[in-house]
Curated annotation (Swiss-Prot):
Pfam families: KH_dom-like, MMR_HSR1. GTP 2 binds at residues 181-188, 228-232, 293-296. This is GTPase Der. It comes from Chromobacterium violaceum (strain ATCC 12472 / DSM 30191 / JCM 1249 / CCUG 213 / NBRC 12614 / NCIMB 9131 / NCTC 9757 / MK). Keywords: GTP-binding, Nucleotide-binding, Repeat, Ribosome biogenesis. The gene is der. One of its GO terms (molecular function) is GTP binding. Coiled coil: none annotated. PROSITE patterns: G_ENGA. Gene3D superfamilies: 3.30.300.20, P-loop containing nucleotide triphosphate hydrolases. Residues 349-433 form the KH-like domain. GTP 1 binds at residues 9-16, 56-60, 119-122. Belongs to the TRAFAC class TrmE-Era-EngA-EngB-Septin-like GTPase superfamily. EngA (Der) GTPase family. Associates with the 50S ribosomal subunit.
């Protein structure tokens, strides 16, 4: 599982700048998805062979003009407590402040690594920039410039030193799904409905604040693993009014699942947080099933309004199946499993190269990719580049400027033909020269003869053999 790194510090020390630098390589994965609005306080990154999740806790801090920190928001404290490592950012130009000391006192109580990074040190000698911060007793200060990238790689290499390199994902032979969603939408009720009251009691166990609970169970002869982020409890103990939303726990659960079940509350408007959580799953490439809960509490007109709002605000989830359920009554829960199975099969599909190439050729016959300047991209063949989510690699020439709209056209075509309902689909391009191409248009043109050998013939053509100059 990817380690989670929390960025901590008082306002205006450069947390957002550092966050953007650490996550910029991942932004393009969802940037071209129409309708997706993404909260920029979480993301993914990589240093060499080590991937990581990163959370900018500054996004959860209250915005106040005075009396700042350490009355950090509850979610900031929760994120710090749940992270695998913490980067404490201070301002090398402003120097040590009372707020820095208060935050450091809290961080010294943690039982996980804390790395002190002195930011905004452009043009300063490292020894001078970090000198006064030794007082915080958090180890040797690491001097960086988030704006220019100086020292950032060295910082992250040190942070990730104790964590293993990326390993191949476990080839799960059955669906492993996470129930995700914002607070108070009925996740715990749905988990209880899925497992059954007896099953919940049998598996009732204390989980730590940092870990979700993994439960294997069988349903109609099929094996599943459910990842419960809220904690499995007896129904009498469930009090969703007290439920806290954990960004880190949700991110980790999605990363470790092969299917995510997103729970929405039909009685509430689709919120930014709903779209953000959906964005987690989309960026991670996870298969997705959406459960719209408390559906039985609405009348006909209200139901139609909810459907319209979902279509407008979550249109980037057009690949997912939507189910309208009542978790507390158990209505619609059985149908969820049909979609979970379908999404899992789609995510783990194996796609044959000959058929992929034939489908590509049909798509090209219907609609060619647009020209980029004077050059039209040429697509030759396709093969599968990965699973969970399925990745289709298209080979050809001049494929560096394919617009997002044409990529979505190909995604739609592949999805329809291969019946990839319920999973995101990635189409990637690889430009290369094809030495076996016999297309006359691609053959190099004959080189013109040297002028010295053409001089006499040129004169004959222009003047004639017996013409006078």
């Amino acid at each position: 599982m990817k380690p989670t790194v929390a960025l901590v510090g008082r306002p205006n020390v450069g947390k957002s700048t550092l966050f953007n630098r650490l996550t910029r390589s991942r932004d393009a994965l969802v940037a071209d998805q129409p309708g997706l609005t993404r909260d920029r306080h979480y993301g993914q990154g990589r240093v060499g062979e080590k991937p990581y999740l990163v959370v900018d806790t500054g996004g959860f801090e209250p915005v106040v003009d005075e009396g700042i920190l350490f009355e950090m928001a509850k979610q900031t404290l929760q994120a710090v407590d749940e992270a695998d490592a913490v980067v404490f950012l201070v301002d090398g130009r402003a120097g040590l402040t009372p707020q820095d000391k208060i935050i450091a006192n809290r961080l010294r109580q943690l039982d996980r690594p804390v790395f002190l990074a002195v930011n905004k040190a452009e043009g300063m000698k490292h020894a001078i920039a970090g000198a006064e911060f030794h007082e915080l007793a958090l180890g040797e200060p690491l001097v960086i410039s988030a704006a220019h990238g100086d020292g950032v790689r060295e910082l992250m290499e040190l942070v990730l030193e104790g964590f293993p390199d990326e390993v191949e994902e476990e080839d799960s032979r059955h669906p492993k799904f996470a129930v995700i969603g914002r607070p108070n939408v009925g996740k715990s009720t749905l988990v209880n409905a899925i497992l059954g009251e007896e099953r919940v009691i049998a598996f009732d166990q204390a989980g730590t604040t940092r870990d979700s609970i993994y439960i294997d169970f069988e349903r109609e002869g099929h094996t599943y693993t459910i990842i419960d982020t809220a904690g499995v409890r007896r129904r009498a103990k469930v009090n969703e009014m007290l439920e806290k939303f954990s960004v880190i726990k949700t991110m980790k659960a999605i990363e470790d699942a092969n299917v995510a079940v997103l729970v929405l509350d039909a009685q509430l408007d689709i919120s930014e947080q709903d779209a953000t959580i959906a964005g987690f799953a989309l960026e991670a490439g996870r298969a997705l099933v959406v459960a719209v809960n408390k559906w039985d509490n609405l009348d006909g007109e209200q139901k139609e309004n909810v459907r319209r709002e979902i279509a407008r605000k979550l249109n980037f989830l057009d690949f997912a199946k939507f189910h309208y359920i009542s978790a507390i009554e158990g209505r619609g829960v059985a149908d969820l499993f049909k979609s979970i199975d379908e999404a899992y099969r789609a995510a783990m599909s194996k796609l044959a190269t000959p058929k992929l190439t034939r489908v590509l050729q049909v798509a090209l016959e219907r609609q060619q990719p647009p020209r980029s300047g004077l050059i039209r991209p040429k697509m030759r063949y396709a093969h599968q580049g990965g699973q969970n989510p399925p990745v289709i690699v298209v080979h050809g020439n001049a494929l560096d400027s394919i617009p997002a709209s044409y990529t979505r056209y190909l995604e739609h075509t592949f999805r329809k033909v291969f019946k990839l309902q319920g999973t995101p689909l990635r189409v990637q391009y690889k430009s290369s020269e094809n030495p076996f191409d016999n297309d006359e248009k691609d053959k190099p043109r004959a080189k013109p003869k040297p002028m010295s050998k053409m001089r006499g013939r040129e004169k004959e053509v222009r003047y004639g053999k017996n013409s006078k100059k």
